[in-house]
Amino acid sequence: MSKETSLPLTYKEKAIVFRGGGLGDFILTLPLLAHIRNSYHEVIFLTKPSYFSLVNKREGILELLDLDLGLSQILKRIEGADIFTFWDDVEWKNELQDLGANQVFILPTRPIAGPHIVEAMFEKMNTPFLPSIFTDAWIGDDWIKNSNMWIHPGSGGDYKNMPFSFYKNLAETWLKKKNSNWVTFCFGEADHKICKNFKEANFIFSARIKSVHPISVEEYKNNLMQGVCEFWGNDSGPGHLAANLGIPTNICFRSTKSSIWRPTGPRVNIHEFDEDSI
């Protein structure tokens, strides 16, 4: 979606943005993309096709291209363009400049210190940053409230994920509160171990628990938009998706820094854990 993200700059002609990475990385780039769309007449955005459904193409001039098809599809369009890329490679930067790029902005990918990653992106561009960026729903504030607690217990890797017992306890506590409450456990393609934990768990009120395995980002988004009371998960892409749909989102940070990686969104709650408390 197109929002006011900073003080207006002089309107420029063309920008080309390259963005790969995981789902969370992509969603954290949406504020920057909105700023670029507000600053350029033409924007070409190369990313994974699986992310296309998260970008509002109706507002402003934006062309979405498949990142995996490479530079060859835009060779003749680089001249005079400002380039925004997350690949910090000298040869890559030189190639873009040789093709006539105006400016090449190398944006941060994995900072371990400093400001929030979104703010760090704006700093790299020497662009004023508005704190309200943190509380916007960058995919759309589409929360529909019902009695379904959505839990995504995996997708963060062993060093990020909370123990499955933590989420089992959350689910059972929620189910005890009201007979109308129910729980959806959601699993990604790499969550085999945690899915096994789920199948082996001896839940109370198991009739009010279901599991889903979305096969695409778009399917996951559509499932969440059908209604939930709140989302619980680890520092991973699904949490960023829920938060930027306006859903009340609880993210458990175990080994990464919430000051750098917390999701943007209007209803985000952060829960910090250290190894001694788990």
Where are these regions (language model features)?
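Catalytic machinery of carbohydrate-active enzymes
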Residues: 1-278
